Curated annotation (Swiss-Prot):
This is Mediator of RNA polymerase II transcription subunit 4. Component of the Mediator complex. Residues 1-23, 214-294 are annotated as: Disordered. The keyword Coiled coil applies.
Length: 294
C-alpha cells in the first residue's frame, strides 16, 4: 500500500486533523491534538483516527450504494469497483492490527504517566506557594544590612564605662536565675539597706535621742535635766550612808553636804506609782542584735 493511500485512508472527513504520514503517526497526532470533550466524542475521535475504521466506513457506504442501484435495476459499476478496492485495503491493513494494539497500550501508559506528572506538578506548585509566602514574610536583604550597619554604628558610639555603669544599675534589680544554683546566695547590692544596717541605724538614732527615750511622760525638759544632773551628782560625790539597826529602828539621817544642786523632794506614794508607770512605758525593745546574721 502506497503512502498516498495510507494518508487518504487515515484522514477522516469529520475531523479537521491534517494528513498523517502513517497509521501510528496519525493515531498519536489525534490523541495529542484534540481538545478535551466528553467521553463519547473522545472515543469517536479515536475511532476516526484509525485507518481500518475509515476503510470499514467506506466499505459500508459503497456496499449500500451498490445494493440501492441493484434494487433499482440500475447497477452502479463505480460503486462495485470502489467496493473491490476497499476490500483489498482492508485485507492489507489486517497485518497492522498488532501495531495498533501496541500503540493503544503505549497511549494508556502515557496517560497514566501524564496523570502522575500532573499530581506531582500540583504538589510542587503548592510547596512553591508556601515557600513564596515564607520568603515574603522574611525581611529584605537590604533592610537587614541597613539594620546591622546601624547597630554597628551605635555600638561604636557607646563607651565601655557607660556600658559598665548601666550594667551596675541593672544588677541591683536582677539576680542569678534559680535554675543555675539554687543554694547560692546572691549579692546583697539592692537599693534598699540590709537588715543589719537598719538595726545599726536604729541604735544610732536611739543613742542620739537618749534624753527623749529616758524622759518620763508628762515631765518637762527642765525637770528631766535636773533629774539627770542629780543622778550624776550622786554618782560623783560620796553617797549618803544609811544604817539599819539590828533592832529594826528608824534609819539615821545622813550628814549634810553642799553640792550646789537642789535635790528633788521625796516622792509620795502617788508619785511612786506614776514613776513605776513611766518605767513601764520606757521599757523599749532596743535589743535588735541577731547573732544568726553574723
Amino acid at each position: 500500500m502506497s503512502a498516498n493511500q495510507l494518508s487518504k485512508a487515515a484522514t477522516p472527513k469529520a475531523t479537521p486533523l491534517g494528513a498523517a504520514q502513517g497509521a501510528s503517526s496519525t493515531s498519536l497526532h489525534s490523541f495529542t491534538s484534540f481538545q478535551p470533550q466528553d467521553a463519547s466524542h473522545v472515543e469517536q475521535n479515536k475511532l476516526h483516527s484509525v485507518a481500518i475504521y475509515e476503510d470499514l466506513c467506506q466499505y459500508e457506504e459503497s456496499l449500500q450504494r451498490l445494493v440501492t442501484s441493484v434494487d433499482k435495476f440500475q447497477p452502479d459499476l463505480e460503486a462495485a469497483q470502489e467496493l473491490i478496492e476497499i476490500d483489498s485495503k482492508l485485507y492489507s491493513n489486517l497485518a497492522q492490527l498488532p501495531k495498533y494494539d501496541l500503540i493503544d497500550s503505549q497511549l494508556k501508559k502515557l496517560e497514566e504517566e501524564s496523570k502522575d506528572i500532573d499530581e506531582r506538578t500540583a504538589k510542587i506548585l503548592g510547596i512553591l506557594g508556601e515557600c513564596y509566602n515564607d520568603l515574603n514574610s522574611l525581611p529584605m536583604v537590604e533592610q537587614v544590612e541597613f539594620e546591622m550597619a546601624t547597630m554597628k554604628k551605635q555600638k561604636d558610639k557607646v563607651n565601655s564605662s557607660v556600658l559598665l555603669e548601666y550594667a551596675m544599675k541593672l544588677s541591683k534589680f536582677t539576680r542569678v536565675p534559680p535554675t543555675f544554683n539554687k543554694d547560692a546566695i546572691g549579692p546583697n547590692n539592692f537599693i534598699w539597706p540590709a537588715e543589719d544596717a537598719i538595726r545599726r541605724g536604729m541604735l544610732a538614732m536611739a543613742s542620739l535621742k537618749s534624753k527623749e527615750l529616758t524622759s518620763l511622760p508628762g515631765q518637762s525638759d527642765q525637770e528631766a535635766e535636773q533629774a539627770s544632773a542629780g543622778k550624776e551628782a550622786d554618782t560623783a560625790g560620796p553617797g549618803v550612808s544609811t544604817l539599819e539597826p539590828a533592832n529594826g529602828g528608824h534609819n539615821r539621817r545622813g550628814s549634810f553636804e553642799f553640792t550646789g544642786i537642789r535635790k528633788p523632794p521625796p516622792a509620795s506614794d502617788a508619785d511612786s506609782s506614776v514613776v513605776d508607770d513611766g518605767d513601764a512605758s520606757m521599757d523599749l525593745d532596743l535589743n535588735l542584735f541577731n547573732p544568726d546574721e553574723f
